[in-house]
UniProtKB/Swiss-Prot annotation:
GO terms for molecular function: inositol diphosphate tetrakisphosphate diphosphatase activity; phosphatase activity. It comes from the Eukaryota. Present with 4530 molecules/cell in log phase SD medium. This is Tyrosine-protein phosphatase-like protein OCA2. It holds the Pfam family Y_phosphatase2. It comes from Saccharomyces cerevisiae (strain ATCC 204508 / S288c).
């Protein structure tokens, strides 16, 4: 059988977990997703209200969890909170393997991958810009790249669910249990990224 990946498909992480990026999967891609990726979770970053009917049926038949994070552009009101929602999903090993897709697999998913590269993998701004340009056909959206560069967050993540690839990132700090507290109170890490003043 011939397997056809979705538009602009590529691995983002393939270490202890598998994280992929792509454009919107079409019916001709479903066999590839089913037999090659074995997904638990799909995160759609885009402006479509609901999955196409065939896509919805495929997700249900494969028991794939589907999350829609609305995004028209990186200028959207509330975009910070939406990117934090994506990070919460990506920082939970129970959601893997994960596919993050937008409509074409270019700009919107490029923003998400850029933030992951910056915060969780320690990529340089130059490397992030180069990858963004590769998937967008050389079109580098200055607003998107500025958003990635200036992105700030402050998330609490349970330690025991953080995937191995992210455990040693520069922005992830262990929260210490307060003296005299029970064992559960120190069971989180905090992902903090602030711009220097």
């Amino acid at each position: 059988m011939k397997y056809i990946p979705p538009l602009n498909f590529s691995p983002v992480v393939s270490t202890d977990v598998s994280l992929y990026r792509s454009g919107y999967p079409m019916p001709l891609n479903y066999s590839f997703i089913k037999h090659q990726l074995h997904l638990k979770t799909i995160i759609y970053i885009g402006d479509k209200d609901r999955p196409l009917e065939e896509y919805q049926s495929f997700l249900e038949s494969e028991k794939i969890k589907y999350y829609h994070i609305f995004m028209d552009s990186s200028r959207d009101e509330g975009i910070q909170e939406r990117m934090n929602q994506v990070l919460h999903l990506v920082l939970d090993v129970r959601n893997y393997p994960i596919l993050v897709h937008s409509n074409k697999g270019k700009h919107r998913v490029g923003v998400v991958v850029g933030i992951i590269r910056k915060l969780l993998q320690g990529w340089s701004t130059a490397g992030i810009c180069q990858e963004y340009g590769l998937f967008s056909g050389g079109m580098k959206d200055g607003v998107d790249l500025e958003f990635i560069t200036m992105f700030e967050t402050n998330l609490k993540i349970p330690r025991n669910v953080i995937p191995g690839f992210a455990k040693h990132c520069l922005y992830l700090n262990e929260l210490e249990a307060a003296e005299g507290s029970d064992d559960e109170s120190g069971s989180e890490s905090i992902l903090t990224a602030k711009q220097p003043i």
